[in-house]
Amino acid sequence: LVESTATGIHSLTQSFSVASGLTYTASAYFKRGGQNAAIIELISTFGTNKWAIFDLQNGVVGTVGTAGIAEISSIGNGWYRCSVSAQATSTGTGYLNLYIARNSTDSSASYAGDGYSGIYIWGAQLEANSASASSYVATTGATASRGYDNAVMTGSNFSSWYNQEEGSTCVEFKMSQPPLTGYYN
């Protein structure tokens, strides 16, 4: 996304149908392209302040609106997966906006562009009834769905490097449901 020389907001916008009460997560992959920050915003049926600024130079979440939940993860080579999650407050048409920002604290997003700077954007995705971003699902404009990501080790394809008797396994994950408490048999 390259900014124009006009004074204004330099952005991409996509509309979508929203059901009240559901949590939606908007995510995209960003990389610096002359500007240092990006904004993801969910508006209209989400009320106000459902946005976050992402610092693409330092790989951190900058300013966050009062009602959004923001996350950033480095995927290497200067690319970051950024996301904002928010609950819809009404049914109707919502809008996902992706903005260029000059820094991670200026939420106005309106400025005079230079005509050549910007940010790289790839893999923008919106997920309904999701409290965080799942893995990327390629689509061609139509709604797509798939099952949960499932990591399973079966068969003998891994026997050359995996020894059941020794070693360590490290797994990073995010709970999609609150943890259960109490005793279960």
Enumerate the predicted regions with their spans:
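Extracellular and organelle-lumenal recognition/adhesion modules and their flexible linkers in secreted
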Residues: 1-185
